[in-house]
Amino acid sequence: FRVTTRLVPGPLAELIADPDRIMAESVLTSLVDSRAERLGSAASFAAWAEPVLGAVDADGFIARRVREWSLFKVLQSGEAVDRAALAASSNWLQRKVVEEADSATVLAVLGETGRTKRIRNLAKTRAGRLRASGQ
């Protein structure tokens, strides 16, 4: 990933500048995942992730992971489903949505647009269960 550390605070800047790119990307991915899990809203995660996005390659894995976490948080908040973004998302995100989504609408969209037959079938099944339980 690209190194631009001037907007990134202390330890994060050191991590991004680490010469061992594979290790740095692995640690940064873990950091992004743990922060996304801890920060409740899409807005709070976006505020935390802004300097990270400014420091990494826009087309790289870390930027994609941040964008996918942002999409997941938006989907969890009940906002409208971006069908194209959900369809284009990675298997990782689609599996996460199937496992954790509380919205039958989100799951129904994924049931139509999922990347794999397994994801589509699981999403349809969960959507049906949520509808049957009145959620």
Task: Kindly give the residue locations of the regions a language model identified.
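Alpha-helical scaffold segments
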Residues: 1-135
